[in-house]
């Protein structure tokens, strides 16, 4: 594989289909603009899919899992063993994303990039085991260069499987105790912002726990701060295996011409990193929701993203993105199924 494949050309949206979809929206039996952002969503999907009437029948969800060495600093309300335990829950159907994927009729795969504790082979889990989690980034880079490259490639491979399955939409989810700390550290570096502005409770820390997390991140930023201008170095030094895989998946989606629906804070930080690695991938990213973590809003603003939902979510797993899929499907259904003024013999507003 090319060591910097993410720099390869991204697909371009179809300007002719964008124009035709916009013209169709203006002919539908409604006041122009009355369906608000649903109209623009349908137009954007038409341009990205190269179809005047887009559809989202086949959805692919991949949950990437990996552990984080920074958990040793006491930054999580949950023990590290939960990461591996949740992998079992995913494939047994008991996790939130498992339920939501079933409801959507979506394909669900789980990729173990590196849990801290070895797991038995679980049916339905791809055990890559690139490392036993990351290193503690207040002491050393979270990942070696090769580990980070392999994690990026794992995301790319997941999109390749989604493409082979004929999927029209890719959702990446994540699982990893400590990954809101890694995401916040990356966001601080990429946005050149203090930890106090971007750190939140994660899985449920109290105020003192949040303050401690911010202090831990500041220590990491002091250690790795000289590399802030390099998104790959920021990813490998402060990120996680699952965050790297998410970034790789978003980049691959743009290169293959598949729309990606980005979930919450951690996924949005991975998306920000992907955009810094290859700015052209931004057009292929839709953003599902604005989550409860305070840093999420700042990351969305940096991406000029307008999330579809605002429900106070902070679960991860891809759950917020899955919840937004019915809204996208309804936007497509309205765009394709409504009659035009001419078809319905309804008088349009005078030109």
Curated annotation (Swiss-Prot):
<dbReference type="Pfam" id="PF02277">
    <property type="entry name" value="DBI_PRT"/>
</dbReference>
<feature type="active site" description="Proton acceptor">
    <location>
        <position position="317"/>
    </location>
</feature>
<dbReference type="InterPro" id="IPR003200">
    <property type="entry name" value="Nict_dMeBzImd_PRibTrfase"/>
</dbReference>
<comment type="function">
    <text>Catalyzes the synthesis of alpha-ribazole-5'-phosphate from nicotinate mononucleotide (NAMN) and 5,6-dimethylbenzimidazole (DMB).</text>
</comment>
<dbReference type="GO" id="GO:0009236">
    <property type="term" value="P:cobalamin biosynthetic process"/>
</dbReference>
<keyword id="KW-0328">Glycosyltransferase</keyword>
<dbReference type="InterPro" id="IPR036087">
    <property type="entry name" value="Nict_dMeBzImd_PRibTrfase_sf"/>
</dbReference>
<dbReference type="GO" id="GO:0008939">
    <property type="term" value="F:nicotinate-nucleotide-dimethylbenzimidazole phosphoribosyltransferase activity"/>
</dbReference>
<keyword id="KW-0169">Cobalamin biosynthesis</keyword>
<protein>
    <recommendedName>
        <fullName>Nicotinate-nucleotide--dimethylbenzimidazole phosphoribosyltransferase</fullName>
        <ecNumber>2.4.2.21</ecNumber>
    </recommendedName>
</protein>
<dbReference type="InterPro" id="IPR023195">
    <property type="entry name" value="Nict_dMeBzImd_PRibTrfase_N"/>
</dbReference>
<dbReference type="InterPro" id="IPR017846">
    <property type="entry name" value="Nict_dMeBzImd_PRibTrfase_bact"/>
</dbReference>
<comment type="similarity">
    <text>Belongs to the CobT family.</text>
</comment>
<keyword id="KW-0808">Transferase</keyword>
<comment type="pathway">
    <text>Nucleoside biosynthesis; alpha-ribazole biosynthesis; alpha-ribazole from 5,6-dimethylbenzimidazole: step 1/2.</text>
</comment>
